[in-house]
């Protein structure tokens, strides 16, 4: 049966439901979700109007979907695609990828999640080269978790949705991940979208803060993210940039996440979702302490395992996580043409 390709800007509810069916079928077959969190949020809530979709139909059945993001003028367009397992091995992946390349003028950065051999074969056979690897690392939560101490004067508490914490976190996150645009470009709207997700739990979103006037720094540096604005300090420590509205200044954070049964095809698993630390605090062990606080929280929730994502090139972070008991589990690969 002949396949046909249709291009879309926004998908309607029926099309979104069909795409989610394809995604879940692929997740069940492969043991890894084929689309990253950003694309899934775009599907559910909409996103940048410049992003688009390519749908591949075989007869009346949706056989494949591609998300195309043309918003990076420097690195060029990026994309992710998925083929329903029932339609694999029939040339539909190549057909869909060629349609995406036609849309982007032949230039594309393509993510393949889980290092799937079929995705690698397709990418290499169509002239792509591998440019980036993102490790997934895991650790048992049954193993001992080291104790930790916070630096002098630092207080640890949890995030309060709908409060000045939101803008303070966005500010620190942007500086923390200034060289990681996927994470550092998050806006207040991006944060609020995640607050609406079923997995969001402020009890697992830890903030480290100092009273205003304590310490020197007002610039942030980054930690680790999932599948990464202006100053993080505030002159008065109130609800200004970096201030949390209670006379304190945000200097670090650890946002944890719990994936349910459907997310990874197995029992629920925790995630070190995002960690960020003010560079004025570096060398004092704050990042390590924040990480361990999150691990202790996830274990207290009864979880058996925790995962995180880290760029293969970030050897310092990999060494830190290895010292905390994490080992490599899987890899996501980016290809470019």
From Swiss-Prot:
Question: What's the stated role of this polypeptide?
Answer: Catalyzes the transfer of acetyl from acetyl-CoA to desacetylmycothiol (Cys-GlcN-Ins) to form mycothiol.
User: Which species is listed as the source?
Assistant: Streptosporangium roseum (strain ATCC 12428 / DSM 43021 / JCM 3005 / KCTC 9067 / NCIMB 10171 / NRRL 2505 / NI 9100)
Record field: compositional bias (Low complexity): 221-234
Regarding protein family, the annotation reads:
Belongs to the acetyltransferase family. MshD subfamily.
Catalytic activities = 1D-myo-inositol 2-(L-cysteinylamino)-2-deoxy-alpha-D-glucopyranoside + acetyl-CoA = mycothiol + CoA + H(+)
How is this protein named in the record?
Answer: Mycothiol acetyltransferase
Q: One Pfam family this chain carries? A: Acetyltransf_1
Q: Which InterPro entries match?
A: Acyl_CoA_acyltransferase, GNAT_dom, Mycothiol_AcTrfase, YpeA/RimI_acetyltransf
């Amino acid at each position: 049966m002949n396949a046909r390709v249709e291009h879309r800007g926004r998908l309607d509810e029926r099309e979104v439901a069909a795409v989610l069916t394809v995604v879940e079928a692929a997740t069940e077959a492969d043991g890894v979700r084929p689309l990253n969190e950003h694309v899934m949020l775009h599907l559910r809530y909409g996103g940048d109007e410049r992003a688009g979709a390519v749908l591949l139909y075989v007869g009346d059945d949706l056989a494949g979907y591609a998300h195309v993001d043309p918003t990076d003028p420097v690195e060029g367009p990026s994309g992710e695609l998925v083929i329903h397992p029932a339609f694999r091995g029939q040339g539909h992946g190549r057909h869909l990828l060629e349609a995406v390349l036609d849309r982007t003028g032949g230039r594309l950065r393509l993510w393949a999640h889980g290092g799937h051999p079929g995705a690698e074969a397709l990418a290499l056979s169509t002239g792509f080269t591998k440019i980036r690897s993102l490790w997934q690392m895991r650790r048992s939560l049954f193993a001992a978790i080291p104790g930790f101490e916070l630096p002098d004067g630092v207080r640890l508490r949890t995030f309060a949705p709908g409060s000045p914490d939101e803008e303070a976190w966005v500010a620190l996150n942007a500086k923390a991940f200034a060289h990681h645009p996927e994470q550092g470009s998050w806006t207040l709207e991006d944060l609020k979208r995640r607050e609406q997700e079923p997995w969001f739990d402020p009890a697992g979103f830890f903030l480290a803060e100092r009273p205003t006037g304590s310490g020197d720094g007002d610039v942030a540096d980054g930690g680790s993210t999932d599948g990464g604005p202006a100053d993080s300090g505030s002159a008065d420590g109130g609800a200004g940039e970096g201030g949390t509205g209670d006379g304190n200044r945000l200097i670090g954070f650890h946002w944890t996440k719990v994936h349910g049964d459907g997310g990874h095809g197995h029992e629920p698993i925790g995630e070190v979702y995002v960690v960020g630390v003010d560079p004025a605090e570096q060398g004092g062990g704050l990042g390590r302490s924040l990480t361990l606080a999150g691990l202790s929280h996830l274990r207290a929730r009864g979880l058996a395992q925790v995962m995180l994502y880290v760029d293969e090139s970030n050897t310092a972070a990999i060494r830190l996580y290895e010292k905390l008991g994490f080992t490599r589990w899987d890899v996501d690969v980016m290809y470019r043409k």
